């Protein structure tokens, strides 16, 4: 506990809140190029092959981003849009790829929650 005199000498500093997605540099999304597309396994107690991509962003960062939805067309050198948002059961994955923009096509045969997967309204 500081004395009154110590507080007069230098006041209390407010705690700075750190961003959860530093690679975006305070932008809503960033463009990037896939350097590697692969699958990885989640933490316990879950079991799956989650699709992820290593992405070099225009901000200079290289991050791991999750590819949402069933099936994708991404490969090395695909240009994609990355947004924030972590995947709870994949350690180190703090970004999502935006489907339906740039080289990432929307999810095929998607009927519900289409806006999250870049799918136009079916006729």
UniProtKB/Swiss-Prot annotation:
Keyword set includes NADP: no
A GO term, aspect molecular function: structural constituent of ribosome
Compositional bias annotation for Polar residues: 1-16
PROSITE patterns for this protein: RIBOSOMAL_S12
Main localization (coarse): plastid
GO cellular component: chloroplast; small ribosomal subunit
Keyword Oxidoreductase attributed: no
InterPro entries: NA-bd_OB-fold, Ribosomal_uS12, Ribosomal_uS12_bac
Residue segments, region Disordered: 1-23
Keywords recorded for this protein, A-Z: Chloroplast, Plastid, Ribonucleoprotein, Ribosomal protein, RNA-binding, rRNA-binding
Span of the signal peptide: none
Subcellular location per the Swiss-Prot or TrEMBL entry: Plastid, Chloroplast
Gene Ontology terms describing biological process: translation
Sequence intervals crossing the membrane: none
Stated role: With S4 and S5 plays an important role in translational accuracy. Located at the interface of the 30S and 50S subunits.
Family to which this protein belongs: Belongs to the universal ribosomal protein uS12 family.
Description of how the protein assembles with itself and partners: Part of the 30S ribosomal subunit.
NCBIfam families in the record: rpsL_bact
The protein's name in its UniProt record: Small ribosomal subunit protein uS12c
Organism: Staurastrum punctulatum
